[in-house]
Design a protein with these regions (language model features):
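Active-site bordering "gate/hinge" segments
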Residues: 1-329, 334-337, 497-518
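Dual-mode signal for accessory low-complexity, basic/Gly-rich regions
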Residues: 291-518
Length: 518
């Protein structure tokens, strides 16, 4: 189990050692102890399997030092780290690496400084997740897997396809995925904030894909939480149900459709397009489609997006950033208007002192300052808050809210004719992020809407969406009432989002040649 007091002592002693060395102007010592536990799900009805496999864990701990050094050319900035050694010898080696790698950075102003904001989230981790043992980890896997198996067994559609209970396994029923638990413990101390601060975080998540292989049908399910008690069999049950619903998928022609985006597609669009576009570094590099638009409308007036970094119970919440600054709420888009950015201390200071600030944000420094508060400096990597990297800008909990929300059934009725897109893959900007153009493939959990109701599943991997994210944001026509925490592959943030309807989404039919091969 992580020991925050030990980490705090290492940060305090490390800072004292570094500060006493010749040529050091200011320094920051970051200490981390991370554990990631995983159990893999692997059920195949037609191939012998274990159901739950590979319970395993990884652990990383160490310290990183960021320091500025005196030189005849001005301050030099360096970073060094040392794994698995929090002793004075480890501190000395990390400092030596920082000194030897130090370079002149004319845009560096200072290491983070405290402001008026104070920490609001403390003692929010789950002791049960910190103390979980191997048997409990395996039991978590079985809980999620059992939800999927029950979903398959109670699906009348599968009984009709198989003809008998004994023949069910010949349909090729598959459940794959994992349950992952992350335990994070950090301490940080710096010249500007010499008293060590600690933060302990726990989270648990599950991802499941269900398949009816003989019918080329698949579905997905997931869950997010911060406590062991949050884990249910929901992810497995959802994956099985959606796989069954996907049987008999149909194609649609190329065209512009009103699309209801499910939570996973919205999360993927946020992760790959909207969140990067709202980062201070993107404005500095003039690589955002929102360039020069702070205070201007960039989305439908019914849409608001913010990063909620300190809300209890949300999976991405932290007490402090990896720069030792308080987390909190950062409004990005409010009622369709761009009002803020995600920023680390370095990126905020760099942009505030940029001669081209007004061109890049659209306002002068006094108006820009409230939109450049450093609440998003995190050291993400290796399954936790990494000691061996410098802070970068990262969101925590992206929350999407819409005015006049309705039920999903009501939203489907209002669409009349269109598509429900429940899962996309390979989402990326084309022509550069600034252009806003993007493409993605619809890979499952999707349906055709006619006359205000769902009439058939959309066949997976038969359409691509090619559109522009600024156009999508501006053409939101409805949102649902319920939000759910959602993760996508390689994302650092969790997105809490409803389902969202957008008009005029361009869809291209693909892979038509596959029909001739069937």
């Amino acid at each position: 189990m992580p020991d925050p007091a030990r980490l705090a002592d290492a940060a305090r002693e490390g800072l004292a050692f570094v500060s006493a060395q010749p040529g050091v102007i200011e320094a920051e010592v970051f200490v981390a102890d991370n554990r990631s536990l995983l159990t893999r799900l692997n059920y195949t009805s037609h191939i012998p399997c274990n159901g739950v496999e590979e319970p395993k864990s990884t652990e990383t701990y160490g310290l990183g030092i960021q320091a500025s050094f005196e030189s005849s050319d001005g301050p030099l900035l360096g970073f060094g780290s040392e794994p698995s050694d929090l002793s004075p010898a480890g501190v000395a080696r990390a400092l030596d690496k920082a000194r030897r790698g130090a370079v002149r950075d004319p845009e560096f102003r200072s290491l983070p400084r405290p402001g008026a904001a104070r920490r609001v989230l403390v003692d929010y981790h789950d002791p049960a997740l910190l103390a979980i043992d191997d048997a409990q980890l395996v039991e978590c896997g079985w809980k999620v897997l059992q939800g999927g198996l029950n979903g398959f067994l109670t699906a009348s559609r599968l009984g009709e396809l198989a003809g008998s209970d004994e023949a069910l396994r010949t349909l090729g029923l598959i459940l794959g995925g994992d349950v992952t638990i992350v335990q994070e413990s950090i301490a940080i101390a710096s010249t500007a904030m010499p008293e060590p601060q600690t933060d302990v975080t726990t989270l648990i998540m599950s991802f499941v894909t269900g398949m009816v292989e003989s019918r080329d049908a698949k579905g997905s399910g997931w869950s997010t939480g911060t406590r062991l008690a949050d884990l249910t069999d929901e992810a497995g049950a959802d994956a099985a149900r959606r796989a069954v619903e996907a049987v008999g998928g149909e194609r649609v022609p190329t065209g512009d459709y009103t699309v209801i985006f499910g939570r996973q597609p919205i999360t993927d669009l946020m992760n790959n397009l909207v969140v990067p576009s709202c980062q201070a570094g993107s404005f500095y590099a003039s690589s955002t489609p929102f360039l020069g638009k702070l205070g201007k409308r960039v989305a439908s007036p019914r849409l608001s997006i913010y990063d909620e970094g300190a809300m209890p119970g949300l999976m991405g919440s932290k007490g402090i950033t990896c720069e030792g600054l308080p987390t909190g709420r950062t409004n990005l888009i409010k009622d369709g208007v761009l009002v803020g950015t995600l920023a680390s201390w370095y990126e905020a200071q760099r942009l505030l002192h940029d001669p081209g600030l007004k061109e890049k944000l659209g306002v002068d420094a006094s108006e820009a300052a409230p939109a450049l508060v450093a609440r998003s400096g995190f050291r993400t990597g290796s399954g936790g808050r990494a000691f061996d990297t410098q802070p970068e800008t990262s969101a925590s909990n992206i929350v999407i809210a819409g005015s006049d929300p309705v039920s999903l059934d009501e939203l489907i009725r209002s669409v009349r004719d269109g598509l429900y897109v429940g899962r996309i893959w390979y989402t990326y900007p084309i022509n550069g992020l600034r252009a806003g153009d993007f493409t993605c493939t619809v890979v499952g959990d999707s349906f055709i809407i006619r006359d205000g109701r769902i009439v058939a599943p959309l066949k997976a991997n038969t359409v691509r969406i090619n559109d522009n994210i600024t156009r999508v944001l501006e053409h939101v026509v409805g949102v649902t009432k319920d939000t759910k925490g959602t993760l996508v592959w390689a994302a650092e943030e969790v997105v809490y989002t409803p389902e969202i309807a957008v008009t005029g989404v361009h869809v291209d039919a693909i892979a038509g040649f596959m029909e001739a091969l069937a």
